[in-house]
């Protein structure tokens, strides 16, 4: 019985571990998903954004006053996803915030595309404005076999 309990705890700990992408692996996924140049945002800018928002961690969560940011792109629960806790959430991406925490980036990418279609575009991300805007971001994809 004790062995089963230890095994169950080990399996549980494995299932909740985050996927932390290598920058080049992440860049390849974005490129394959049509993100390079999407709405004028270069692949290097997307990679820079994710580096500074989550350090490429799919399980990144940051709590703000009145909302929470989720996943590799730090999608906000006030405007883009539904976490069931944020009052008056818009949920413009029509998704649960939980799906932004798994290793499948397809919904994260689709929601990020939705964010940049809004008037603010990529400027919606504070980390992008602080670390990527008007900077040489080529280093974020340098050496990647794209």
Swiss-Prot record:
Chief subcellular location: secreted
Pfam families per the UniProt record, alphabetical: Lys
EC number: 3.2.1.17
Disulfide links within the chain: 24-144, 48-132, 81-97, 93-111
Gene3D superfamilies: 1.10.530.10
CDD domains: LYZ_C
Location of the active site: 53, 69
InterPro entries to which the protein is assigned, alphabetical: Glyco_hydro_22, Glyco_hydro_22_CS, Glyco_hydro_22_lys, Lysozyme-like_dom_sf
Places the protein is found: Secreted
Record domain C-type lysozyme: where: 19-146
Alphabetized PROSITE patterns for the sequence: GLYCOSYL_HYDROL_F22_1 (PS00128), GLYCOSYL_HYDROL_F22_2 (PS51348)
GO terms assigned for molecular function: lysozyme activity
GO biological process, alphabetically ordered: defense response to Gram-negative bacterium; defense response to Gram-positive bacterium; digestion; killing of cells of another organism
Enzyme category, top tier: hydrolase
Keywords recorded for this protein, A-Z: Antimicrobial, Bacteriolytic enzyme, Digestion, Disulfide bond, Glycosidase, Hydrolase, Secreted, Signal
Keyword Coiled coil: no
Signal sequence range: 1-18
UniProt similarity note: Belongs to the glycosyl hydrolase 22 family.
Additional free-text comment from the UniProt record: Lysozyme C is capable of both hydrolysis and transglycosylation; it also shows a slight esterase activity. It acts rapidly on both peptide-substituted and unsubstituted peptidoglycan, and slowly on chitin oligosaccharides.
Function field: Lysozymes have primarily a bacteriolytic function; those in tissues and body fluids are associated with the monocyte-macrophage system and enhance the activity of immunoagents.
Name of the protein: Lysozyme C-2
Source organism phylogeny: Eukaryota, Metazoa, Chordata, Craniata, Vertebrata
């Amino acid at each position: 019985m004790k062995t089963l309990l230890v095994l169950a705890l080990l399996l549980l700990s494995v299932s909740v571990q985050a996927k932390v992408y290598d920058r080049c692996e992440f860049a390849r996924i974005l490129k394959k998903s049509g993100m390079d140049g999407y709405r004028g945002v270069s692949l290097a800018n997307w990679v820079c954004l994710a580096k500074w928002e989550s350090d490429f961690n799919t399980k990144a969560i940051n709590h703000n006053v009145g909302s929470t940011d989720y996943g590799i792109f730090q999608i906000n629960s006030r405007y883009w996803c539904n976490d069931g806790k944020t009052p008056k959430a818009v949920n413009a991406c029509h998704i649960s915030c939980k799906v932004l925490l798994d290793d499948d980036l397809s919904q994260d990418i689709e929601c990020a595309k939705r964010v940049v279609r809004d008037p603010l575009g990529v400027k919606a991300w504070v980390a992008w404005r602080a670390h990527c805007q008007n900077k040489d971001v080529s280093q974020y994809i340098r050496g990647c076999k794209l």
